[in-house]
Amino acid sequence: MEETKVTRDTKEEILITALHRFARDGYEAVSVSQIAGDLGITKGALYRHYKNKRDIFDHIVARMEQG
């Protein structure tokens, strides 16, 4: 299935929101529920894009490594 612009935008918003949360509160203190709540989406909606919190973190790190 082809990724839509909305899906790409949602994935990007999840990464940005998670990065801000991780920077402010620390990785261990942040939950998937908090990230989803900040975005106004359900955990189920977030899990459609990323497997878990570690998957989100790994995508953030990969982006940073790309420059």
Predicted regions located by residue number:
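Basic, helix-initiating cap at the start of DNA-binding domains
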Residues: M1-D25, A29-I41, K51-D58
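Key DNA-contact positions within bacterial/archaeal DNA-binding proteins
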Residues: G44
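Alpha-helical DNA-contacting segments of helix-turn-helix folds
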Residues: D58-M64
